[in-house]
Amino acid sequence: GPVQPTYPGDDAPVEDLVRFYNDLQQYLNVVTRHRY
């Protein structure tokens, strides 16, 4: 199954935070799609 992205940390660069949230959104989309 999909691997949940790990939070890069509060002191991570903005690019890493943006990438994390994008990955998290895709992860949640995949998880919810498989659930129903």
Curated annotation (Swiss-Prot):
Keyword list (alphabetical) reads:
Amidation, Hormone, Secreted
- UniProt cross-references to SMART domains, sorted A to Z: PAH
Family the entry assigns? Belongs to the NPY family.
Q: What does this protein do?
A: Hormone secreted by pancreatic cells that acts as a regulator of pancreatic and gastrointestinal functions.
Q: Which GO terms describe its molecular function?
A: neuropeptide hormone activity; neuropeptide Y receptor binding
Record's protein name: Pancreatic polypeptide
Please indicate if the UniProt record lists Secreted as a keyword.
yes
- Name the GO cellular-component terms: extracellular space
Q: Which CDD domains match?
A: PAH
What is an annotated GO biological process for this record, any one? Answer: neuropeptide signaling pathway
What Pfam families does this protein map onto?
Hormone_3
**Organism annotation:** Larus argentatus (Herring gull)
Q: What is the lineage of its organism?
A: Eukaryota, Metazoa, Chordata, Craniata, Vertebrata
Classification via InterPro entries? Pancreatic_hormone-like, Pancreatic_hormone-like_CS
PROSITE patterns for this protein: PANCREATIC_HORMONE_1 (PS00265), PANCREATIC_HORMONE_2 (PS50276)
User: Where does the record place the modification Tyrosine amide?
Assistant: Y36
This chain is encoded by the gene named PPY
